[in-house]
A protein has these predicted regions:
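Basic, low-complexity terminal or inter-domain segments flanking catalytic cores
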Residues: 2-13, 145, 152, 177, ...
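Metal- or metallocofactor-binding catalytic centers and their adjacent structured scaffolds
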Residues: 177, 271-302, 308
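Intrinsically disordered, low-complexity regulatory segments
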Residues: 1-198, 485-486
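C-terminal or mid-to-C-terminal helical accessory/interaction module adjacent to the motor/catalytic core
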Residues: 107, 113, 120-121, 163-250, ...
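A short acidic, leucine-rich amphipathic alpha-helix
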Residues: 307-311, 495
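A conserved hydrophobic secondary-structure block that centers on an alpha-helix together
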Residues: 130, 314-318
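Structured, non-catalytic alpha/beta "coupling" segments that mediate domain-domain communication
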Residues: 39-76, 226-269, 418-463, 666-668
Length: 740
């Protein structure tokens, strides 16, 4: 295809976040064709009913194509020492650029160049990245980086990639200025995270290094990362320090004259056994009987966290597995946008879900259609302005074609919708009162309604005796003793629940309110990635397998995590407290509402960082003396592990994880190029290869090719990986390339 095919001054350019998303947009036009030239891919589309019938160019990125510059790109003195056993130049820190600048991320240059030729010449740009803060950040950052005039920029904001909603979205474009504050919020968040992460990670890591404590990889400090780790550490301390205490429950063993027996209980628990009134008599009376019909409405629809919680409880899925499945279902047009914290829909969604009820019934044959009018519990346009709850789209999948996890996650979403259309759950609750203070209750299911989707088995009956008010019973008081139990360790699912409901752990009313409004630590869309990163990348937490079907591994801090948690709690406690996150979230929310300037917020972050640099060099060495670091193993006190002779320089040794900032292989010889072109262990992690092992590292550094499995879009490929000598980067090629 010749380059002349590419429009020189396009009327409209649609900027998508991902290739699949761009394809969905293009396919919504009646006329569409994909092209490729030397600069990349693009679509040319036209439709008499869309965008004035003009010619439209659709281009796609691959997520974030820009990143904040590294410290050394601002100032060569920021960052690392070239000599000695020091890696961070604390004498030139903290790192505080006067202006934060972006650069093109590794591997994204051609994507940016492809986008540039269209975006800079377009009469109107339509931002069509994901409808969230991150999507806004990706697009606006690129437009600003390319100096694109945003005066006439529009925003496509939709919650489904189906053809109908896409077309409707193009017919009802928003002005980009409406969503621009989301960019300000997210960009400011990324700068603040950079300031905290870059500076305090370097500071803590180097001070530990200087004082003889050498961990494998840096001691990562992050706004959400540290409080998340601290939740696990604090739970561990609660379990370790837990001391069982007795408590008592006052019961009456009752027997009718017909021989029917039951146990009635006094409400509450007693710590002091002597505080319980003694019942010495052997006969008592039934003082009251109440039977009430009670109703329970269906649960709310699910946001992403609710979906993850449900999948963990019912299916034993890890949160990240559920999120991945939901995002795949969104790409396939079977679910609405999953990265949401909203639990309601609009009447538009309610109506099409109602129309599709008979189709969904094929998945749940015993479903009934009772509730046909929208109720505010599930349908509330005022709360669904930006996003919706996760619900099925109009497109019905063939379940047999879906992978197991995707099928099950899809059915969870359908089930929540079918429950919304069902009748309430009705049951009769009977309470028998004995001697005024003791009660026993039982319930009989009258109509399971929506509960039938979640309650297994037939209607449950809890047997109660046939008695009357005033009837005399044989009674015997029995005080049962129990022991309190320690809290349970977190797993990935319960940790995310704790992150969501962290306000419940806070006493301060103001902080509690802010955290509740911010919906906890992180967001439903980011929590899984945060937990995964703390485990796999930073090695601060680890998973311990648990026996039992559908039981998730428990989480515990590693030796490295325990040490960092102690350091934080004794030197800079605020970094590990949800309170700091609450204050940040409140400030960022105000930025998105344009009531606080980004500069004012970042000035406060600046003060926090400077305070750490002024106090920690004195405090941290003292604190380290109070911490047992022996559990860190060889990396804790001794020199890095030697795995072999360096084939590059021939004189130095290849060291395993000698670098405190990165989990990498490097050379002991200061002049060796492997010192500046280290081989990072996690280079291939995003393709499913967890970590480069020592034996593999030696072969790669020698210039050999290693067979490996690459995972892309759920498919596995046989590849060969090798180290490019000129750059030190890991490259790959197909092991069995297709012949042309």
């Amino acid at each position: 295809m010749t380059e002349s095919i590419a429009p020189q001054n396009p009327e409209w350019v649609v900027l998508a976040e991902k290739a699949d998303q761009g394809k969905d947009y293009a396919m919504a036009f009646k006329n569409h064709k994909r092209y490729k030239d030397s600069k990349g891919y693009f679509w040319i589309c036209q439709d008499p009913d869309l965008l004035n019938g003009d010619e439209v160019v659709v281009i796609a990125l691959q997520g974030h194509v820009l990143e904040l510059k590294k410290p050394e790109e601002y100032n060569p003195n920021w960052g690392m020492f070239p000599k000695e056993e020091k890696f961070f130049r604390l004498d030139t820190m903290p790192i505080m650029p006067q202006k934060f600048e972006l650069t093109i991320a590794d591997g994204k240059y051609m994507l940016v160049q492809n986008a540039k030729r269209f975006l800079t010449k377009a009469k109107t740009v339509i931002i069509a990245t994901d409808p969230d803060r991150a999507g806004e950040h990706i697009a606006v950052a690129l437009l600003r980086f390319l100096n694109v005039d945003m005066t006439n920029t529009k925003r496509l904001w939709i919650n489904s990639l189906e053809k109908g909603p896409v077309r409707k979205g193009f017919q009802n474009l928003r002005d980009a200025s409406e969503t621009y504050p989301y960019y300000l919020e997210d960009f400011t968040r990324s700068v603040a995270d950079w300031m905290i992460g870059m500076n305090l990670t370097c500071l803590y890591s180097q001070l530990c290094w200087d004082n003889g404590v050498r961990t494998s990889g840096a001691l990562a400090i992050g706004r959400v990362l540290v409080p998340t780790m601290m939740l696990v550490w604090q739970r561990e301390l609660e379990i370790i320090n837990f001391k069982p205490e007795p408590y008592y429950i006052d019961t009456l063993l009752c027997k009718t004259d017909k021989g029917e027996e039951f146990v009635a209980k006094r409400s509450g628990e007693f710590k002091d056994k002597s505080a319980i009134p003694v019942i010495s008599k052997l006969r008592g009376n039934v003082t009251d009987i109440k039977t009430e019909r009670e109703a329970q409405i269906p649960d709310k629809l699910m946001d992403l966290q609710g979906l993850k919680n449900r999948a963990a409880d019912e299916l034993g899925y890890k949160p990240d597995e559920t999120q991945e499945a939901a995002e795949e279902l969104y790409k396939k047009h079977y679910l609405t946008y999953p990265r949401t914290s909203i639990k309601v829909i609009t009447e538009n969604e309610f109506n099409y879900l109602l129309d599709n009820h008979s189709k969904y019934k094929a998945f749940f044959p015993d479903a009934n259609l009772v509730r046909t009018m929208p109720k505010k519990t599930w349908v509330d346009a005022s709360k669904a302005k930006e996003h919706l709850a996760i619900v099925p789209t109009r497109t019905i999948p063939d379940l047999s074609s879906l992978p197991e996890k995707e099928k099950n996650v899809y059915l969870l979403a359908v089930k929540s919708v079918m429950a919304m259309f069902e009748d309430d759950y009705y049951y009769d609750k009977t309470t028998i009162e004995v001697e005024n203070d003791y009660t026993v209750s039982g319930s009989v299911d009258v109509d399971l309604g929506w509960k039938k989707f979640y309650k297994k088995g037939k209607n449950t009956v809890l047997s109660l005796p046939s008695v009357k008010v005033g009837e005399e019973l044989s009674i015997k008081q029995e005080i049962a003793e129990y022991m309190t139990k320690p809290p349970k360790p977190y797993n990935s699912s319960t940790l995310e629940k704790a992150m969501e409901n962290v306000h419940q752990l806070i006493d301060d009313v103001t902080t509690k309110k802010i955290l509740q409004g911010a919906k906890g630590l992180g967001t439903p869309a980011t929590r899984s990635a945060i937990v995964k990163k703390v485990i796999n990348h930073h090695k601060l937490l680890e998973e311990i397998p648990v026996k039992g079907k559908k039981k998730l591994p428990i989480l515990q801090t590693t030796a490295k995590g325990k040490m960092l948690a102690e350091l934080i709690s004794k030197t800079n406690k605020v970094l590990g407290e949800p309170k700091m996150t609450a204050e940040w979230e409140d400030a960022l929310s105000r930025i998105s509402k344009m009531t606080l300037s980004p500069k004012a917020f970042l000035d406060e972050i600046n003060k926090l960082v400077w305070h750490a640099f002024q106090t920690l060099p004195t405090e941290l060495p003292k604190v380290l003396k109070t911490i047992d670091t022996s559990a860190l193993g060889p990396a804790g006190k001794s020199a890095p592990v030697v795995i072999g002779k360096c084939p590059i320089c021939g004189t130095g040794n290849i060291l395993d994880s000698s670098h405190p900032k990165f989990n990498a292989y490097t050379c002991s010889e200061e002049t060796c190029e492997l010192r500046t072109k280290s081989l990072f262990k996690g280079t291939l992690s995003k393709w499913g290869h967890k970590e480069i092992k020592p034996k593999e590292a030696i072969e790669l550094i020698k210039g050999e090719k290693i067979p490996c499995k690459l995972t892309f879009k759920s498919k596995k490929y046989d590849i060969l990986i090798f180290r490019e000598a000129a750059t030190g980067y890991i490259k790959w090629e197909f092991a069995n390339p297709k012949k042309k």
